Structure formats: structure tokens, C-alpha cells
Amino acid sequence: MSARIGRLRGLCLRHVSSTRQTSPIQRRSLNQFISRVQQHDQPALEQRQFRLAVKDNIATVSPNSEEETPLTTTCGSNFLANYRSPFEATIVSQLRSRGALLVGKTNLDEFGMGSHSVHTAFGAVAQEGEHEQQAVKHSAGGSSGGSAVAVATGEADIALGTDTGGSVRLPAGYTGVVGFKPSYGMLSRYGVVPYANSLDTVGLLAKEVRPIAELILGGADKVTRGLWAEHDPLDPTSLSHGARRRCASQRDCYTGPLPKDPYPLKNLKFGLPLEYNITELSPSIRHSWSAAAAKLQSLGARLVPVSLPSTRHALSAYYVIAPAEASSNLAKYDGIRYGTRFTSPTESDAAISEGPEGREEEEEGILYARARTAGFGDEVKRRILLGAYTLSSAAMDNYFLKAQKVRRLVRRDFNRVFALPNPLLDKPERFELSELPETVGLEDKWGPTEVDFLLCPTAPTTAPRLDEVLSEEEKDPVSAYMNDVFTVPASLAGLPAISVPMRVEDKEGAGMAGLQLIGQYWDDARLLAVAETVADVVREEL
């Protein structure tokens, strides 16, 4: 048995390092959709209707009428290439009832695992570069890159994505659109193919903040209820009606639609996290971040430095917790109970049937190994292996449990820094210098000033060229994990966060980046109101 495990381990690692999922032909198109609704099927938009693109890990049934053929829900994977869901995700049904017309299912990193939307069985997603000639493609970010490009190109008014560690905000920052991740538990996850249950959050993308705010808070007609108020009994992580009312009662801006007048910035306190000013931060983004902060200050806002000591460990904790949950969620894909059955022989067949008991081993495991070898892409296999190891008895204490401890510390840092208390806590967090050892540097002992929002970049760089991304993926496939360094902390804490477009100037010329605002739990309504004002200010200034 041990010999068999050794052969399988060698086979898996060999496969992860050798197979690519994209081709030069596929890379020449933007490739933002996996499936589209035919144009002749789309009626003219009526009042209150809008075009909706849905990330292809969110279940849909027929496009816009029961007579039409259901679209597939592939998750960007060979395993689900022909899967048609018998039911529809709650969030899609909710948006249909508000006038959404589905235009297609968007491309993504397989099962939502990636930062550039290149780990997909349907070809890498790209965006046209602003810096150079239009033939040059740049990364669209991930994993909701297809949704971001669909909005940026004007093919959708609203796009749904999923944000596990930044998969809505990062593509929004790269493509120059707005990407919103609500508080964990606000929007239903029923019908979303899970990656990491404790982190997965449905997010929305649009060119402006207001269309997103109208869906979350309710329209100006005061008839359509905001999504924030809708509990889904089919989703165990959806906050109950009572909890929603209790949370909203402690917050502003939930009493009606977003005001038409800009939200006043005077006396609002924005925190600038010291730990986010990292060495890897692009000088052009650092300059634009500073310029945006200065502009807000000139309009009456207060800008103060704050310290979030534990967030420097957030990225490491995330890449322990998320793969661990993924390895469990993806165990059902075996080609027998769930997923496509692959019948063609693969190199795994020969490896499994080596040895004296080859036929017996073949009968036991060849179908399972063949399906998972052919069905999963490289990045998914990498995270499954990592997750399975961190959940093993040998690594549980040293990795998974410590990562969960870091997650609690990250959440505590955020709760201490915000002026508003977390409505899910019985008592507010307190900052105590005595809790920090003497070896901790002075900057980490800077007691957090209570702020309304945190202001920081969405990503440390602008969108890289796609050919450079693909080349780097070959040499160092985990280097892309660094792109999530500013988005992961809010995900670990379950906080609302939004990325708004910010123009930057670098050696290649003008480009787009994202400016991120993070709020306290369930402060989504005020966050959206402030984000609209900030987006307008940044657009005028930079």
C-alpha cells in the first residue's frame, strides 16, 4: 500500500509541474465568456432591466426563459465541462426578480483558485493593455477575471463574482471597474460551487458604485427591497432576519436608497495601515495612494496611520486555511459519484498498475486516479495536495490550527481599529500593550486609532502583461499568491470591502489600479455611500 501511495504522490507532483491549460490561439482573444446567450435571444432592455454576467461557478438554469437550453456551470474545469445545474443560485434568482437579463457565464480560474484567470480549461482571460499597442494583452486578475472584463468592455451592466481572498476586488482593480465584497453572510451562497466555505462570498462588479448600491440597499422607487435584508434559509451561512435587523439597527444608511448627494467626507476618519506599505508596493501605486489620501484630507476627512500587527501573517494563514477547505470540498469529484468520467487511458494508469498486485490496484483506484488526473488543472491539484497535507495528523497542529489562530488575531486587530463595534460580539475588543511581548517593535505597539474606514491599495502592482504572467507561472507558480496580500485580511475577518478605480502613472504611461476601502462588519451601506464619493474624488484628481 505504501508503495502505491509513493507512486501516486510522484505522479501527482510530476503532473502539476508539467501541464499547461492555455494555448496561443486562446490567448489572442479576451476570452471573458465560457458561454453566452445568443444576441437574438436578448429582448430590448426595458426600464429597470439590466444585463447580468454570472461567474461560471454560480449555478444557473435557462438563460432568460424556461424554454431555452440551460447554460453550463463549468467552474472553468474539465471535470464540469458539460454540467448543467438542475437548480439556480439564490443570488441569480434574486437579481432576475429585479430585472436582470443574463448575457452569459464568465470565465474564471478553475474552482476560483487563482489570481490572474489563467488556470482555466477554457483559455486565459485577458484585457487590452493601456500602456502600449492594443495587441498587447494584460492580466484581468482573478479569479473573477471574466466578470471584470465583461463589465469593463460594456457587455454587462452588473457581473456576479465570488470573492474568497480578493477574487472580485483584484480583477476590479486591474480592469478599472468597481468590485464589492459584502460582509460575510449578507448575500446567499446557495448555488455557489464551494472553494472555501468559511471565506467564499458572492460579490458584484459594475462600472460605478451606484448600481451595486441600489441592489444592496434597494432602489429609489422604495419598492424593491435591498439584498441586505433577504435571508436565505437554504444557505446555513446566511444571517437570520433577526440578526440582520440587529446589525442594521447599529448602522447608518440602511433606512433607504443611496442618497443622490455625495456622502460628506468632513470629519470622517480614514486609517492608513502601516503594514500595507510594503517593499513590494509599486512606487506608482504608492504615489497614487498618497495623492488620494491627500485629496480626501483637503475635503475635510481625517487621515491617520494605524497598525494592524497580525495582518502581516494573513496571507500565510489564508494559503493554509483555503486549500485545506478546498481539499475537503473537492473530494467528491471522482468521476463516479460526481463529475465527468474520463475513460481514456492516461499516464496515471501505468503508474498505478505497476508492481506485483497491479490488476488489483487497477480495479481499486484507476478510475478515481484517471478522473482526478484528467479533470483537475495544475493549480487545483497543487492546492488539494497542500490542503490535504495541512489537515494531516502530522501537520494539523503546526499549520492549520496556527493559521486559525492568526485568523482570530486578524479579526481582533480590525475590531480594535474601527470606531464602530462588531455587532456580532458581546463586548468590544480592547487594545492592551501588555499583550505584546517586549520583542515587538515600537511601530507594532502603536495603539489603533478608532477609524471609520481603512484606505489602502487593492493590489501591490498594476495589471502585469499576460505573457509575463504565463512565463512566471511556469517558473514559480506560487509567486502570484502575493497579489492577494491587501485583499486577504478583510476576507479572513469577513468584512465588507470595495475596490474603486484609481489612475496611476508609471514608466509605461497611464494605467489603472484599485483603491480599496474596508469597513467594519455590516457597515456595508455606509461603505458604499462613502465609496461613491471617494470614487468621484479620485476620478477628478488623478
Swiss-Prot record:
Keyword Mitochondrion: yes
One Pfam match: Amidase
Residues at the active site: K55 (charge relay system), S143 (charge relay system), S167 (acyl-ester intermediate)
Locations listed in the record: Mitochondrion
Catalytic activity: L-glutamyl-tRNA(Gln) + L-glutamine + ATP + H2O = L-glutaminyl-tRNA(Gln) + L-glutamate + ADP + phosphate + H(+)
GO molecular function: ATP binding; glutaminyl-tRNA synthase (glutamine-hydrolyzing) activity
InterPro entries: Amidase, Amidase_CS, Amidase_dom, AS_sf, GatA
Gene Ontology biological process: glutaminyl-tRNAGln biosynthesis via transamidation; mitochondrial translation
Main location: mitochondrion
GO CC terms of this entry: glutamyl-tRNA(Gln) amidotransferase complex; mitochondrion
Entry's EC annotation: 6.3.5.7
Keyword terms of this UniProt record: ATP-binding, Ligase, Mitochondrion, Nucleotide-binding, Protein biosynthesis
Subunit and partners: Subunit of the heterotrimeric GatCAB amidotransferase (AdT) complex, composed of A, B and C subunits.
Similarity field: Belongs to the amidase family. GatA subfamily.
Role, per record: Allows the formation of correctly charged Gln-tRNA(Gln) through the transamidation of misacylated Glu-tRNA(Gln) in the mitochondria. The reaction takes place in the presence of glutamine and ATP through an activated gamma-phospho-Glu-tRNA(Gln).
HAMAP family the UniProt entry points to: GatA
Protein name according to UniProt: Glutamyl-tRNA(Gln) amidotransferase subunit A, mitochondrial
Organism of provenance: Neurospora crassa (strain ATCC 24698 / 74-OR23-1A / CBS 708.71 / DSM 1257 / FGSC 987)
